[in-house]
């Protein structure tokens, strides 16, 4: 860890006492900052509150008083807090810098950074690359949006390690000097319009991952979307991946995977299910090769890696019915991949937070959907979608209720699929919690 001096004696406001806010506050305190933590909820009964106040850190919960901005030189914002918060808007008029904690991770780390973002596939790719590193000479440390606070992991990472960092658009909006040696963008489609306001703002946020890169760095990019790069001043070397074309990078030719002209593995030896996952595999191979991982470690991983929890996860088979948990599908593209993975009659559980999106992108993916079980804020939109396509549907209270109601309709040889196409935050704190509710109820059948 680099012991930087820039925060010594500076007044820093940490917005949000979640996992990242807690670790950020402790780090800034150790770096000599005068730290105040603010959360919109009453946090006075939490263990984090007790620990931070015992350290001498001020913690204010329940509201966001504008007086907190007096003499503040920096705000470290929880990525989920919108920029429309009045405190943030006032800070912007005062030209107070606003960052997310991944910027702090970059400032203190001695490690190389491999940053991964994208609308879909980023968690799978991050996990896959992490597994490829496990047998490698140097450590690949997972952090960021995948659940391990980046600034905490960075404190213990050495100069020969690599931070394999999953990055959301929310996190990338709050970077200033952050520079990954290898940046990987899986794809960019419509998402998070409630947060970003419009599609262009969302694309711009994703492309932030490239803004400080130089000609010494790499950008791994989906060949299907290469025209997006025309609107940005990309200084890094671009390496493409494609399932359809021979490209400068990772590609498939006659069911064999290549990196440039080097053979890596036969497609038949890759165990990760789903045609869409071939793009994730190619992106991961490109990153691993650029990071210096040997082919044997890459191939060993691809022959054993079956996927991640809550992403097309097989839960169980009961009375001839197979149950799949795809709670991580928080947008229509991810759900289209899930629906396309099955040909059997499918009972589809869908719904959640209304981000302003429609569901018309799923029009061509639902021929085999036998029944829909709809819950959450998007109930009205999804019932209209079901009616338009003449799909029988049942309105449910939540995921647990939806699983219970499938029993009235499902038959042997069919599939029950939770693939919500929506974020979870209207009813569940995370997609993981939503998925666990599904799993728990399925196991009671």
From Swiss-Prot:
PANTHER family reported in the protein's UniProt record: UDP-N-ACETYLMURAMOYLALANINE--D-GLUTAMATE LIGASE (PTHR43692:SF1)
Stored InterPro entries: Mur-like_cat_sf, Mur_ligase_C, Mur_ligase_C_dom_sf, Mur_ligase_cen, MurD
Reactions catalysed according to its record: UDP-N-acetyl-alpha-D-muramoyl-L-alanine + D-glutamate + ATP = UDP-N-acetyl-alpha-D-muramoyl-L-alanyl-D-glutamate + ADP + phosphate + H(+)
Function comment: Cell wall formation. Catalyzes the addition of glutamate to the nucleotide precursor UDP-N-acetylmuramoyl-L-alanine (UMA).
Molecular-function GO term, any one: UDP-N-acetylmuramoylalanine-D-glutamate ligase activity
Lineage of source species: Bacteria, Bacillati, Bacillota, Bacilli, Bacillales
Pathway in which this enzyme or protein is active: Cell wall biogenesis; peptidoglycan biosynthesis
Positions bound to ATP: 118-124
Keywords: ATP-binding, Cell cycle, Cell division, Cell shape, Cell wall biogenesis/degradation, Cytoplasm, Ligase, Nucleotide-binding, Peptidoglycan synthesis
EC number from the UniProt entry: 6.3.2.9
Chain segments annotated as coiled-coil in the UniProt record: none
Gene3D superfamilies per UniProt: Mur ligase, C-terminal domain, Mur-like, catalytic domain, NAD(P)-binding Rossmann-like Domain
Name of the protein in question: UDP-N-acetylmuramoylalanine--D-glutamate ligase
Keyword Ribosomal protein set for record: no
Cellular localization per UniProt: Cytoplasm
Pfam families documented for this protein: Mur_ligase_C, Mur_ligase_M, MurD-like_N
